[in-house]
Amino acid sequence: MTAGPAIRPDGGPGTQPGVVSRWADLGGPAGGPLIVCVHGLGGSAANWVAVAPLLTGSCRVLAPDLAGHGLTQSRGRGTGVAANRALLHRFLASVSPGPAILMGNSMGGMISLLEASAHPGAVAGLILVDPALPLLPAQLDPLVTAVFVLYLIPGIGRAVTARQRRQPPARQVAGVLRLCCAEPSRVAADVITRHVQVLAQRARFTGAGQDFSAAIRSVIATVGCPGRRAYQRRIHSVACPVLLIHGTGDRLVPVTAARTAARQNPGWTLAEITGVGHVPQLEAPVSTARVITGWLRAAGRTAAEAAAPGRQEQARPAAAG
């Protein structure tokens, strides 16, 4: 993984005011379809290092760290869903004159859906990997429900976050993988090391716990009450091609939610990966990449063409004169 040009060699703040401070250029041909990967709650660009090399033979892949996540400090910016959707939009405008394909996992899938609804011209297509979808309480795993409730109680959520952050980074990563994966041992050792490195760097940031608490409350408010119906309306307004990938063993967003979304949006392509949890791009990168590349050649072909810089140049009006 290489650092994108918005990152100074000394690791200082990014050079683009109002845009993400840290992002990764994961490779791929300059003329290939642009895929921008959007991580989930508490995640980072590292969430994509396993699957990206399997896509960069034909696609250009970038992955930003959203505000309050990864190595992008909030610095007074909001870390909730709406704020990071706006941040993503500015990032897209800064890296490409034309539309991109957004690939979002969990909260990143939600933010990608909202961006496609708010700015359809900026999004050629969506690849949703176990996205945060509208949920009813009965659909949730009891343990997951209990954790979410804790974060909604004033003071308790921050205390839980503070306790987690006192653990060594390796233990934090292991705990997240146990929750998010059906079989954590499937995640490659070098990928785990990269996540530990990011958390070790993030441990030096001030306000990281408050940033996470604000983000998780925002996600819960969007998928549940009071925002669920508004979120559903935004989802139904999305007109671009959509690939919905979902692990059948996901405890955070059950596969029944994905099946419901696919029924309600018949133009979407649903691909279930059996026996995999909430992060297929980490737990089953080969299967995930196979589904993505197949979609890009078939139902997502128009999205791939629209996201390719060469096509964007052809579509741009000729200069007068």
Regions found by a protein language model. Give the residues of each.
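Conserved alpha/beta-hydrolase catalytic His-Asp/Glu region
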Residues: R163-R234
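Flexible "cap/lid" loop of the alpha/beta hydrolase fold
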Residues: L126-Q164
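Acidic catalytic loop of the alpha/beta-hydrolase fold
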Residues: C225-P226, G249-V253
